């Protein structure tokens, strides 16, 4: 179920503060955030966020296509190594 329209998008307050500070400073550095649940807003376009995946910060360059998505969608938490090969089939 999607979020109610009347509530508006959810963004942690510290993410907004960090984004505003980065915009004002003009420096293009990675903004480290831990809030995977925050929604990407239009004012974040052009900024680079380091989204934490449980081990490290994954750099995410925000584009216009990402608006409305969550930061967590661009920072995978699990590594897929593929299915294990069938040992019986290898012996033949």
From Swiss-Prot:
CC terms in the record's Gene Ontology section: cytoplasm; small ribosomal subunit
Keywords: Ribonucleoprotein, Ribosomal protein, RNA-binding, rRNA-binding
PROSITE patterns: RIBOSOMAL_S19 (PS00323)
InterPro entries: Ribosomal_uS19, Ribosomal_uS19_bac-type, Ribosomal_uS19_CS, Ribosomal_uS19_SF
Gene3D superfamilies per UniProt: 30s Ribosomal Protein S19, Chain A
Protein's GO biological process: ribosomal small subunit assembly; translation
UniProt key word Ribonucleoprotein: yes
Entry-linked SUPFAM superfamilies: Ribosomal protein S19
A Pfam family annotated for this UniProt entry: Ribosomal_S19
Keyword check for Calcium: no
Gene Ontology molecular function terms on file: rRNA binding; structural constituent of ribosome
Role noted for this protein: Protein S19 forms a complex with S13 that binds strongly to the 16S ribosomal RNA.
PANTHER family: RIBOSOMAL PROTEIN S19P FAMILY MEMBER (PTHR11880), SMALL RIBOSOMAL SUBUNIT PROTEIN US19M (PTHR11880:SF8)
UniProt record similarity statement: Belongs to the universal ribosomal protein uS19 family.
Protein name from the UniProt record: Small ribosomal subunit protein uS19
Species annotation: Ruegeria sp. (strain TM1040) (Silicibacter sp.)
């Amino acid at each position: 179920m999607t979020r109610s329209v009347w509530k508006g998008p959810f963004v942690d307050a510290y993410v907004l503060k960090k984004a505003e500070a980065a915009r004002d400073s003009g420096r293009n550095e990675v903004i480290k955030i831990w809030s995977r649940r925050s929604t990407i807003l239009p004012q974040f376009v052009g900024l680079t966020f380091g989204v934490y995946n449980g081990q490290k910060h994954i750099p995410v360059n925000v584009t216009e296509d990402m608006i409305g998505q969550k930061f967590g969608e661009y920072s995978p938490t699990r590594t897929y190594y593929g299915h294990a090969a069938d040992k019986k089939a290898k012996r033949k």
